[in-house]
A protein has these predicted regions:
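Charged phosphate-binding loop/patch that engages nucleotide di/tri-phosphates or the phosphate backbone
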Residues: 190, 194
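Short, flexible beta-strand-to-coil junctions
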Residues: 38-44, 77-80, 133-141
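Residue microenvironments linked to proteolytic maturation
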Residues: 4-7, 13, 73, 92-186
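Polar/acidic, low-complexity leader/linker segments enriched in S/T/G and N/D
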Residues: 1-65, 182-189, 199
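Secondary-structure transition/turn motif
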Residues: 35-45, 89, 106-113
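Short conserved beta-strand and strand-loop elements enriched in small hydrophobics
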Residues: 69-84, 130
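A short, polar/proline- and glycine-enriched secondary-structure boundary/capping micro-motif
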Residues: 46-48, 85, 115-119
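A structural signal for short, hydrophobic beta-strand segments that form beta-sheets
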Residues: 16-22, 38, 85-95, 154
């Protein structure tokens, strides 16, 4: 298959985070955790990009060290930077595992300013997405997809509003399911959330 070098730099992969079980953990003083698909291999996402399984497996293996040291931090929204800014951190990834070509992740919401916003959004039944952030290049395949190349380096997983990978919405680990996607009055809702936090 002939491929043409297309682009290099910061790569984002957005997915709806279909979290199963989003709930305050009984054993951790009400800390909110979420579990769901955070990455998919071997299939095009909404950005027309394909991540080969061997590359994702390699990067996930490297990411385990950050998970072990509780340094697998992520931000709320998606900055155009290869560096995680501590002032914007909202969560930490605590575990990942493969189920077929789906990478499943468990995320713990942190008690930070951005983490409080994230928790408020979750509490308002807003369906969020998850997005990987990494550095690397892509090449165009004959089928018209952008294939991620071997130089890809994973930076982190961010929580976002518009993911590109299908099935990457996260759910609260709770008895109820989060099915409502709020599309209207988002700015008004964010103002209310910020006011709630400022009043704490």
């Amino acid at each position: 298959m002939t491929e043409i070098l297309k682009d290099s730099g910061l790569l984002h992969n957005f997915m709806i985070f279909e979290y199963e079980d989003v709930q305050p953990s009984k054993s951790s003083d009400g800390i909110v955790t979420m579990k769901g698909i955070i990455q998919k291999a071997q299939q095009p996402n909404a950005n027309n990009r394909i991540y080969p399984r061997p590359i994702l497996e390699r990067e996930d293996a490297k990411y385990q060290e950050l998970i072990k040291e509780r340094r697998a931090l992520g931000e709320l929204d998606h900055p155009d930077s290869p560096i995680v800014q501590l002032e914007n951190v909202s969560h930490v990834v605590t575990e990942t595992l493969w189920e077929g070509d789906d990478l499943i992740g468990t995320i713990e919401v942190l008690d930070t300013p951005k983490g409080q916003i994230l928790e408020k959004l979750i509490g308002r039944d807003i369906k969020l997405g998850i997005s990987s952030r990494g550095l690397g290049s892509t090449s165009r395949t004959n089928e018209g997809y952008d294939k991620v190349e071997d130089d890809f380096n994973l930076v982190c997983y961010d929580m976002v509003s518009n993911p590109s990978t299908s099935g990457a919405y996260m759910n609260l680990q709770e008895s109820r399911e989060y099915k409502t996607l709020v599309n209207q009055n988002r700015m008004v809702l964010l103002d209310e959330i910020l006011n709630d936090i400022l009043e704490l």
